[in-house]
Amino acid sequence: MAHIIEITDFSAPELDIYARLTENQLVNRADPENALFVAESPLVIGRALDAGCTPVSFLMERKHIEGKGAEVLARCPADIPVYAADLPVLTQLTGFHLTRGMLCAMRRPRLPSVAEVCANARRIAVLENIMNPTNIGAIFRSAAALNVDAVLLTAAGSDPLYRRAARVSMGNVFLVPWTYLPEGESWPDLLHDLGFRTVALALREDSLALNDPRLLAEPKLAMVLGTEGDGLASSTIAACDYTVKIPMSHGVDSLNVAAASAVAFYQLALLNG
């Protein structure tokens, strides 16, 4: 049985990880061996455990200890701290109503190299400076559903392990392999060295159609999506082998990046991956 610790005061220091440390502070770039993230809801926590993430502690509504949290707790060491409180205490925690009554602090896993993530991959997504955790989560959910083998991110973008990103992804940030691209070098060249051809999603008049036979014939394809608002950098588009855009109607000029990713993944990965 887990080690249950009753919490009656929102100011209790045991709640600092969950209530007072920012997600950037939890990342702890100065001491990556002790970096943490917080997963929320039994579904997301369960998928993190499936991926081998190590739990540090739990915070949960007391009634869930023997309820919907019991199965998750049964998978964890018997001495793991489980901070339990009644709902009036926990509702002081911003966004607690979205957690399904359960939070878990976990060790951040070691990220693999780009070569490791891309080994045996045929269709990958590259996310350049995408800042919104909701978009990151939605893209990962689409990637898992639509046959994308891996996701690569630039370091300036949002963290897939942020609570909102993991929640929106339905835990699929723990299913789809991912890592960050190295800073200070040309990642299109790196992907070319790994055998990938790159396709930029961008609003250019000379863009190809998504079902262009040249794209469908590529054995290894990296689909490159850009930041909200501005899209991909001009230098990135120039470095890619192809540029495509999604046909629009009714005068609409573009889709949200998460919606655009789903359309591209469906055409280029699920149907032709």
Model segments located where?
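A glycine-rich helix N-cap at a beta->alpha junction
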Residues: 75-95, 179
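Anion (oxyanion) recognition and catalysis
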Residues: 49, 76, 192
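Structured adenosyl-cofactor binding patch, chiefly the S-adenosyl-L-methionine
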Residues: 102-104, 142-146, 157-173, 234-273
